[in-house]
């Protein structure tokens, strides 16, 4: 018997994922793709795209969704310039930042930029340097810039590239850091931007724990701290500032999500018709989805999914509170029908909802017309 798209026993995970993609070419997920996937874990559509290794922005373009909040070329160039400046001249700005924060001593100044090596050597050199730290060698660097790590998800290694690893001589292992070019606004920095940076570092933490495990460590959770070291641009200047954020919950959430990848793949396969593949936009849009208001922060397909939710009368289009309030009716269309027809009878929950809606309508009328 030949294996089908729903035959989850006869094939390895990579083979099943290749069938899922069809003619589409897989692309790296990266830390950003993995953390966004964890935020949309209940959406079969997004999990299908992520597991198959398809770039969500490209899929969104094919199904007619505009990418939201694209950065201007100036913002992108400015961000790249800041991140590049942090690694220039022996990373002296980063060293000064960590010394000012009490994380490094003045004499702790060994820096290795992995990106300066030939691509074929970067992964091995990253592991070698981490091994030096685990062995307590005095040659271990204090800053490793652009380390090459990986996490295993759904049977394949996903490359993870944190901006930096940092450790003093007294530290047992490195902490993971991320450099962001948006300004540190003294506590008023966009919460969404900070959350995104922290979650990406959480993926880096898991990748570093995987690396130390591969080097023989038996207690990676103790060795590798869950804290996120986020380097921001100081307001009104090109100098950096440092935020250190504990993120145990984020690390645990993403770890559980990665562990669930095989089960998520089985759910995706079960939702697909026989022979259907994700290189067909119609197949993508026919998959079960769960649109929430925060999808716009985490998924390029949010606009297309919102259109579907609106067409289906899903109350989520008026917000999470609206969905909870209208839950008894299950759709905004049914809620309007209950409101418009005083003689309509449904379940006890629907009747209670109808009474609340009519009371709200009366109050609104009185407020508007006196």
Q: What do the PLM-derived regions correspond to, one by one?
A:
Residues 308-318:
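Short cysteine/histidine-rich zinc-coordinating motifs and their immediately flanking basic loops
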Residues 288, 292, 302-310:
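Acidic, Mg2+-coordinating catalytic module of metal-dependent nucleases/exonucleases
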Residues 246-298:
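Polybasic (Lys/Arg-rich)
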């Amino acid at each position: 018997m030949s294996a089908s798209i729903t035959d989850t026993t006869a094939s390895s995970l990579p083979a099943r994922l290749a069938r899922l993609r069809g003619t589409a070419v897989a692309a790296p997920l990266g830390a950003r793709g993995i953390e966004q996937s964890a935020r949309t874990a209940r959406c079969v559509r997004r999990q299908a795209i992520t597991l198959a290794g398809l770039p969500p922005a490209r899929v969104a373009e094919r199904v007619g969704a505009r990418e939201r909040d694209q950065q201007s070329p100036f913002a992108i160039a400015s961000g790249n310039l800041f991140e590049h400046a942090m690694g220039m001249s022996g990373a002296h700005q980063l060293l000064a930042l960590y010394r000012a924060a009490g994380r490094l001593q003045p004499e702790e100044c060994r820096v290795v930029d992995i990106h300066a090596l030939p691509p074929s050597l970067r992964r091995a050199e990253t592991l070698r340097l981490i091994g030096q730290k685990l062995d307590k060698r005095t040659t271990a660097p204090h800053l490793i810039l652009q380390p090459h790590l990986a996490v295993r998800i759904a049977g394949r290694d996903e490359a993870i590239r944190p901006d930096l690893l940092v450790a003093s001589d007294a530290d047992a292992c490195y902490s993971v850091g991320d450099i962001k070019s948006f300004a540190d606004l003294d506590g008023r920095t966009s919460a969404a931007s900070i959350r995104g940076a922290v979650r990406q570092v959480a993926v880096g933490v898991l990748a570093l724990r995987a690396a130390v495990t591969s080097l023989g460590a038996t207690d990676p959770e103790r060795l590798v701290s869950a804290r996120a070291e986020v380097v921001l641009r100081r307001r009104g200047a090109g100098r950096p500032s440092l935020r250190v954020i504990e993120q145990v919950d984020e690390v645990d959430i993403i770890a559980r999500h990665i562990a669930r990848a095989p089960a998520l793949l089985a759910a995706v396969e079960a939702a697909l018709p026989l022979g259907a593949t994700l290189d067909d936009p119609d197949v993508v849009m026919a998959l079960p989805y769960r649109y929430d208001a925060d999808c716009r922060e985490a998924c390029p397909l949010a606009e297309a999914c919102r259109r579907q939710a609106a067409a289906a009368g899903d109350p989520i289009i008026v917000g999470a509170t609206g969905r909870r309030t209208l839950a008894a009716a299950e759709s905004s269309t049914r809620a309007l029908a209950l409101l418009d027809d005083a003689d309509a009878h449904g379940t006890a929950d629907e009747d209670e909802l109808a009474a609340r809606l009519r009371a709200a309508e009366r109050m609104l009328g009185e407020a508007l017309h006196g």
